[in-house]
């Protein structure tokens, strides 16, 4: 597959040919189910005539059906473009196909999509990760040059790691959330999934920047990262030793090999433990579900989306939500409503926010002394379909990614090895807030060392 860097140098006629070839390949590879159109048999959604970029099904694109992988949004047509889409169009890139996802981005396997499963292109018996599983599978499967996803607790980094591509979550507030269907407003962040680190940096440069339409967008100085990539730069890297040691044997072996390569190249490696990670999962799911219960209250069958049969207004609300939401979404709405309810708000939500502040302080303390943090993306490689049916087990699988969202830091997953089942293993790098340049420099160095 042509890289994004190469595609941006093509003439308009060459881009036209590329789009035709890519569309033919998407139709041929229908079994992968990376795109909603592959699962439904509908024509491929397109906007613009530029370099084709696959778009997760929770990002608004004017005139497209955008459903967030949910039955409740059947029939909804987006009336406007997300800011990220406007930025693509302004740089001669185009929205090209809706990628499958876990319903409302709530999941780690892309098994909860209303449209059906997406397969992992490396091994079809295994999940592609989630919630941006369609975006990662499309890029890794050679049916997308690059893609946009969203990351609330690892939903860009983890599927990219499971499928063997690069997943980049920018600092919270760096990329506008205007036009992103909200799951958890204080955690969600749009970002790129790409074939390599440089392509991820290029796509990030295009979509990043302050946006007055988004109240959570930070007005922080921004300059191009891709133009200044330096994979030769020597960095101080802190390895989270207990996270590496607690990973599966194959993952641990691959991570230690990557650490040795970084050390031999000249990066300074130090080791530390994050001992208080036992609070991460609880804090994340309390905060995320609390925000989700509020954000998803707008889906009532009245204003947009699917409307159920009903005799009165109350019945309309109840029937539309009961029939429209999947089991995982219902579970998280109920949990979020519970933790915000009278008598439990202080016991759960306020404590979770205090834990969040503690988690952020832990990262800041480490990053005061190191340029980057190195740790796993996931404790294991991609599991088989059905193995994550236990909600608690599924929630615990995010243990190495969710704390980064709680802290609002930039992070990236970089492929480093394959296991005996041809499944990918990735390392995760984390940087200080707003220091995407150092993050990309470190990721490029790691990528170069792995590729030899």
From Swiss-Prot:
Q: Where is the active site?
A: 56 (charge relay system), 131 (charge relay system), 155 (acyl-ester intermediate)
Q: Which InterPro entries match?
A: Amidase, Amidase_CS, Amidase_dom, AS_sf, GatA
Q: List GO molecular-function terms, semicolon-separated.
A: ATP binding; glutaminyl-tRNA synthase (glutamine-hydrolyzing) activity
Keywords, sorted A to Z: ATP-binding, Ligase, Nucleotide-binding, Protein biosynthesis
- What are its GO biological-process terms? translation
Q: Give the GO cellular component terms, alphabetically.
A: glutamyl-tRNA(Gln) amidotransferase complex
Q: Does the keyword Protein biosynthesis apply?
A: yes
Q: How does it assemble?
A: Heterotrimer of A, B and C subunits.
Q: Any idea what this protein is called?
A: Glutamyl-tRNA(Gln) amidotransferase subunit A
Task: List the source organism.
Answer: Campylobacter curvus (strain 525.92)
